[in-house]
Every structure is written in C-alpha cells, then in structure tokens.
C-alpha cells in the first residue's frame, strides 16, 4: 500500500526531538564496548521480588524489564527488547549506537507507517502485509513478548499500537525510556543486535482491525452514532485553529463534530499526559485531564492527532486498563 521511504519530515519540532536519538553513527556495528550508568549490584536475586504484570499491561518499569531479563518473570524469559526511533536502520541512529538496553534490537517507525508524506499515504499505517513482513524480519510473531522503549513517547506508542493492531498479543513499553533505565542503575551496551527471522506470524494481520478507524468510518459515525466520539489529541492552538501544528499542513482546524481531548502543548509532545519525570500518567491521571471534556469512558473513543502519533498514547493507556471501545482515526488532521 505504501513505500518505506523517508522523504518528508513529520515536523521540524518532532524531528528535532528524534534527531537527538538518530544522527550520524560514530561507532562501528561490531563494537563490543559496554558501559554502566552507575555502580550497582546486578544480580538475579535483586529483581526476584519485582511484581508480575498482566498481559495487557503496556507501561512497565525498568525494574520489571530487568526482572524479566533476569528470568524472574514467568513466561518472559525470551522477551524481545527494541529501541524505537525514526529512521531505517540501527547504524544511523545515534542514540542506539551510544548505548541501548542490553539485547535490544532497533525498530524504526518507518517499519509501521508510510513516511513518504504523500497524499495517498497520509502517514497512515503501512499495509498489513508490509507490517507483517517487517515484524517477521525481527523474529516477532503473535506470541512474542515485546518490550519497546524510545526517546519519543508518542513515536514509541505508535509502534506499540501498530503491533497490537497487527496481533502481537503482549506488547509493553518501558515507561520513562532509556533515561529511566539508566536512572535505575542498569547497564547499557553498544553492540548491534538483530532478531532471527520468523516464517509464520501465527494469525491473520490485522488481528484487531477494530482498533483502526478510517476517514470514511469517522465521518459516518460522527454523523450517525451518538455514542461515537472523535477525540482530538492536539494542542489548544491546534484545536482553536490558530495553527495546523505542522510546517507541511497549510490548513488549520479540526474535523467537524470532533471533541477536544487535550494532551499536548505543541504538535511534538503529549505533555498533559506525562508526569514531571517524563513517564506516562496512569489512568487516574488521564481521567483528571479529561474531567471537563465532552466525552466519557463509556463512549466509543476514536483518538486522532495530526498524523497518528500522539493519539496512540491515550489508546494504549485505556487498552491496558481493559477498554475495547477505543480506536485510532489514523489519518488525523493531515488526511
């Protein structure tokens, strides 16, 4: 459906954020050096008492991931860890080369969405066959336990959402990313890791088409379904039509019939949904943000933003809390 070509930048602000992670590679792929963030005992005994989490739990602590890697989380002995950034490969990603969670492979956002900036692509998810192919290239199937992290909260959430939509049954994100991992005193490494290609995903992709809303469905449901709420996860200035939020979008405004779900200060953040330490808020935190909004959690909530990144953060928080009356209007304001 779409080509995996990085031709048009998502936005100056967003790319600036991601460029901190991905730039020129100053290290060779075969470097074996490892660093420690702090002197801290690194034993399996230390993480044996970390509490387990449910399969649908998305946001986990660094301590939980370390416990899983230490073999102290039953069923997560072979977890696949991946750093998410915007780009085609690990060797061009500066943050990955400078140091990543041990064992982490590299996954680019361009593996799940059209990044050509074309009118047809609209930064929507790639075709089911393309996403399945990219998952299999990393050895990821529906039964793989996946833990993602990245320097951009919404970019990482975008990939997690795509994996869940595709059918990966257990997808998690290290809340706070590599900074939280380092703060916990855990090691990083610099060697490049790659998964072993898998042959069969194990189910039809997408396994959860209900989590994706098209522009046609959004228009129809806004007009004809009182329980359907098209929820804008955009800044106040975007919501009020003062700015499109993007240097490649001339028109400002919102789809007719949409309601505002707050979430952002600019097109490049989800500041309303994060704590002071950079972690994503829990459900109670989201409820506080939404207490004056024109929807309830009993509505079907189709989240959208500019191109589909910010909208995935509230989706994941509701998903991990058992809500299924949720989706992402993928095309967003751009489409």
Regions found by a protein language model. Name each.
Residues 33-47:
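Extracellular mucin-like PTS domains
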Residues 19-37:
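Bacterial lipoprotein signal-peptidase II cleavage site
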Residues 23-27, 44-335:
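Cytosolic catalytic domains that perform sulfur/thiol-centered chemistry
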Residues 2-25:
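Sec-dependent N-terminal signal peptides of Gram-positive bacterial secreted proteins and lipoproteins
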